[in-house]
């Protein structure tokens, strides 16, 4: 029998999964629809498509882990699932970093030569960083795959894969998150400085007038700030999720930490939708029609 607490956690996990599934699905469909309408990929559409696609995968990986972990705790394929999970998580972080670079390039207004040089080469530098990340992670993944086929001898972790050495390699693979996170923080910091500088100029020259650029700054910072908070929750919950799977596993702790982790791909999709007026209006219309249809049909 499931306890009341575990049942509640399972309900929250299902709700988060549905929110993430619908939210990221809407963003993927919108990106494709924009491409079909214009027959031209914009940088923003590509970033949103990649970000939503990675979040969609991440949501499925979390729900698969929660569903199958109690049944296949000692299965070898769950080890590879954990490695794939890390790679998808890092890809999601890279696309969020590209989004912060996009906001920084489009919104910030500095006139310093170093900034103008960096602004012109922002996408190229980001793509080179992504290529370097891909090569390093490919080498680490091959090394980890070989270790899974030749595990340390005389260790009980062969029987219980979540006990010790495998996740040391998963943590090593996860160290690739530092570079995109640093780029993300630098881009967000430049947005904050740009907003502060712009606010000072507006106070002097155009007090009382509608400030569209300041609104764009604030909207971008809200989205990036929420992402940073949710990503930090995700990072802090990950080690506890791993340690709760050590033998004997604590199923309640696994659900607590992975439910916190699932908030990252599900809730940020809603924040992105709220920041895209056309998608927001479409979702509001669909929701309103659903409510009206339910009222017409009755209970």
Swiss-Prot record:
An example molecular function term from Gene Ontology annotations: G protein-coupled receptor activity
Gene3D superfamilies the record matches: Rhodopsin 7-helix transmembrane proteins
This protein's GO CC annotations: membrane; plasma membrane
Keywords assigned by UniProt, alphabetized: G-protein coupled receptor, Glycoprotein, Membrane, Receptor, Sensory transduction, Taste, Transducer, Transmembrane, Transmembrane helix
Residues exposed to the Extracellular side: 1, 67-82, 149-175, 245-253
TM regions (residue ranges): 2-22, 46-66, 83-103, 128-148, 176-196, 224-244, 254-274
Main localization category: membrane
Coiled-coil zones: none
Glycosylation sites: 155
Pfam families, alphabetized: TAS2R
GO biological process: detection of chemical stimulus involved in sensory perception of bitter taste
Record-linked InterPro entries: TAS2R (IPR007960)
All ranges on the Cytoplasmic side of the membrane: 23-45, 104-127, 197-223, 275-299
Membrane topology label: Multi-pass membrane protein
Location(s), subcellular: Membrane
More about this protein: Most taste cells may be activated by a limited number of bitter compounds; individual taste cells can discriminate among bitter stimuli.
Physiological role: Receptor that may play a role in the perception of bitterness and is gustducin-linked. May play a role in sensing the chemical composition of the gastrointestinal content. The activity of this receptor may stimulate alpha gustducin, mediate PLC-beta-2 activation and lead to the gating of TRPM5.
Family: Belongs to the G-protein coupled receptor T2R family.
Protein name: Taste receptor type 2 member 5
Gene label: TAS2R5
